[in-house]
């Protein structure tokens, strides 16, 4: 480096690196404090900044909170351990109970569904903290099921977690046997994607109806009663596509427990009941469209549904119900004949019945025309004032659209994980749609023996990058200001075999225009945390 006419001339590569190191350390020190940004560096300097400099600096200035020895949730204290991964932003939302909040769109949707099952007992206030045994073991989830992973589930400690589905209460409710029919609606928690359709806390509703063989003189008498109950159900004008037989090898009858006649009549009762519910929901959606001056479904063609064979861990045979809506088939729910071993675990071997599960957000977004799942958590009066459970359903009127602020982050994965596949989608994160009774869909297992409560959750995995971790970091730092996180490039260097990923993070406030400085500050903090936790090298 030499001086010429009062200016310092950088003449060698080493000097360039030292100069860039000095500048970026100053800038990033301020950036990590929230008052300046790496992106404010001169364009001529930014290319000189090496990922190693960014890594060292961010590691130095990224804040790292000490893990508490216990978590206080809903007035109770839970010890933490190496499995604990529940962030404060999730705990701060625990107990909001949007599904029972008066005049909230989720509550209105829940009530509309429950109205079609007037004799069912409704469980709407079950606690969200459950045991591993309740959430997984009691339902027959195998020890290596991906839903058990810390990358997918919020653990309070190794034996306790935030429920991932309403089915965590299923065995307990069946065992209590307070009513032949019930619904459960609740908030559920899963680590997963960041976009307009996914949120780490969402709401499920499940229902089930059973008949007690002990109340009848024979199986035939029970079948006759179910037939009478079926004939008493409301008839509807739906066009129904149901081309498959009730059971077949790909969708099997539970031959150890059910006769063909029992499965047939239970399936008929199930399908008619859920078709009636769908008519109610989509009729209201059609009315709301008409009131808003939009083209309604009924103007083009009658409402039609179709039954599609499916596989779920708690039912067999099983189906998904799809509705033809605005030019496309929309999956609404999963359902089936209850898996008899589940009833055995609930000490109800004499009962037979059906169950269904659905996502409340999915139906509420359709019913009210709500475009972004984050809105359900808004306390903005401009949102909440649009809904009134005492009045007909009306379409949501959006606020003025605030501009998006996209930012990209590109990084090399550490050498220890390069070449290994990135996990972008597992059964627990692929969708918020539940299987029957709210459970997580999975593939059939080659093992038919259910797991028992003494089977342990797999060992805590070593720290390695998982896409859900980036989603979690983004939500922890940016909260609801991050609208979308998407992988846009996955590159492996042909010679060095190092793997690079590039993600686009879109920032957008629902309530006001976000400044460039605010977006840059959030992005810098997310980048610093990514480097701190996983040792990635920013490109």
Descriptions of predicted regions:
Residues 217-257, 284-300, 417-464:
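Intrinsically disordered, low-complexity domain-flanking/linker segments in eukaryotic proteins
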Residues 199-213, 217-268, 352-358, 362-368:
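A conserved active-site cap/scaffold subdomain adjacent to cofactor or substrate pockets
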Residues 2, 26-29, 41-44, 63-204, ...:
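Class II aminoacyl-tRNA synthetase-like tRNA-binding/catalytic domains
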Residues 300, 308-444, 449-539:
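A carboxyl-terminal module marker
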Residues 101-109, 262-273, 462-470, 518-522:
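Short amphipathic alpha-helical segments
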Residues 69-90, 231-250, 396-397:
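N-terminal, Lys/Arg- and Ser/Thr-rich interaction peptides
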Residues 124-150, 284-325, 489-496:
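Beta-rich nucleic-acid/ligand-interaction surfaces
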Residues 1-66:
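N-terminal mitochondrial targeting presequence
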